[in-house]
Structures are given as C-alpha cells and as structure tokens.
C-alpha cells in the first residue's frame, strides 16, 4: 500500500495471518471477533473508521474527508499529548465557552459489535447494566439516545434532531466508545465512560455526581484527535504511518 512501509499488503478474506501488522476497517462482518483473536495471538494492530471531524458525507461525496487510524484500540486513547491546534482549527469548530448545566443523563450506546469488543456484552445489556449502576448513585433522569440510522446508513446526516440540539438539557453524557463523546465535550457537556476505549475521558460512573467540564481541556483533546485522522493523500504520503507511531 502506497505510503505504508514494511512490505506487501495482503487483503485476507480468509483471515489467515500472513505476517506484518493487522489493520481492520470498522466492525463490519466478524471484525470485532477477529480483533480479539489477532490481539491475543499477534500483538499490535491498527483500526480505521469514521473520523472525529471531517466525516465523509454522502450528500457531498466529492468533499475532502478523513478517516481515523488508531493503534491497538478503536479510539485514540493518549488524549493529553499537547498536539498543536492547526489540524483541528482548520475545521472551524468552536468549543463551547461554558458548561451546559442541564438535568438529563444521556446514554449514548455504541453498536452491538462495539459493545461486544470493548465490554464483552451486548448493547442491550450495556444499556440495562449502566442504567442500574447510575440509579444506585443518583436520581437524575436518564434518557437513551441511539445512534441515528435511516435508509441503510447511519450518522449525523440522518439524525432527525442534531446531537448538539438534543443535549441542550444534558447534565452529562455516558458512553462506552461512542463518537458522541467528542461532540458532547465540544458542546460543553461532560462525559463519563464505562470502558477504557473512550476517546475523551477515563472517568467512570462512580464520578458522575462530581463530573465537570473545562473548555481548555476539551480543546486540547480535540487537537490530539485531529492528529489521529487522515485524508487519503496523507495516507499515500506516509504522514499517517509516521503519526500512528508504527515501529
């Protein structure tokens, strides 16, 4: 693959290991099981999927778009690297100036395959167990917001209510590995998580009554996430390879 060092690239439809580092795109098919097997047997792997910013939009298919690439995780977990702001700033996204102080705890489940991969449970079980845990700590109202899906596709472009609008009365967002975590901190909403694969926080549910939000921290996290996603040109040039820290 152009821009990717280390010899030949194999597309392993038969899932037979042929050496080198494995790379998985999304959780299509049995990728969630393959990642677990690969991690146990062969070590380091890469994961690519939708980006944190600059997502491909089917309504504007010719626009430049990005894809996140993460090493040994479905998300960038080293979120306090103090990366420069240039890549994030080019998107023109404004970080909220103050915290949203609403009432609702909003659960944002990931896909069923994602929950199986990062939490060894189904989406339904995650929702039920998370609600049960939260209710032992607080009596705040809880609402589940599923990822928008319509006409065989998913994502922000098919949402009936934009996420930023839907969290205007949020106290916090609870997620495992959902991309909604990123949009939450951009909009001034704190996040707590149930896994170590969350792209913006490591705070668990036990911290839910003390959770807070800081604009400078949100901006620094977004700066790092913008350095964890790449255009096709940046993959061809070798920039993505270098930024992924592959040795």
Placement of each model-derived feature along the sequence:
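Short amphipathic alpha-helices and their capping/turn segments at secondary-structure boundaries
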Residues: 37-40, 91-102, 132-136
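Active-site regions of enzymes building and remodeling cell-envelope glycoconjugates
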Residues: 6-10, 18-23, 37-46, 61-67, ...
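Donor nucleotide-activated moiety binding/catalytic core segment of transferases
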Residues: 12-15, 135-191, 196-197
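Conserved catalytic-core segment of nucleotide-activated headgroup transferases in glycan assembly
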Residues: 100-151
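Secretory-pathway glycan-assembly enzymes, especially type II membrane glycosyltransferases
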Residues: 1-91
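Short, solvent-exposed loop/turn segments at secondary-structure junctions
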Residues: 27-30, 51-54, 110-114, 148-151, ...
């Amino acid at each position: 693959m152009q821009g990717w060092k280390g010899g030949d690239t194999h597309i392993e439809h038969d899932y037979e290991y042929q050496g080198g580092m494995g790379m998985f795109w999304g959780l299509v098919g049995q990728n969630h099981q393959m990642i677990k097997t690969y991690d146990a047997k062969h070590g380091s792997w890469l994961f690519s999927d939708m980006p944190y910013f600059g997502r491909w939009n089917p309504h504007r298919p010719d626009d430049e778009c990005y894809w996140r690439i993460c090493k040994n995780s479905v998300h960038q977990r080293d979120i306090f690297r103090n990366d420069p702001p240039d890549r994030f700033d080019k998107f023109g996204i404004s970080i909220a100036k103050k915290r949203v102080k609403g009432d609702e705890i909003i659960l944002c489940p990931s896909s069923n395959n994602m929950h199986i991969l990062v939490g060894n449970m189904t989406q339904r079980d995650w929702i039920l167990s998370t609600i049960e845990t939260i209710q032992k700590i607080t009596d705040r109202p809880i609402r589940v917001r599923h990822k928008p899906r319509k006409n065989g596709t998913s994502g922000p472009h098919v949402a009936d209510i934009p996420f930023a609008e839907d969290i205007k009365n949020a106290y916090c967002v609870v997620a495992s590995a959902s991309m909604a975590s990123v949009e939450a901190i951009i909009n001034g909403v704190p996040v707590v998580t149930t896994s170590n694969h969350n792209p913006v926080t490591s705070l668990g549910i036990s911290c839910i009554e003390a959770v807070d939000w800081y604009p400078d921290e949100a901006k620094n996290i977004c700066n790092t996430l913008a350095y964890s996603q790449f255009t096709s040109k940046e993959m061809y040039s070798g920039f993505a390879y270098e930024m992924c820290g592959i040795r």
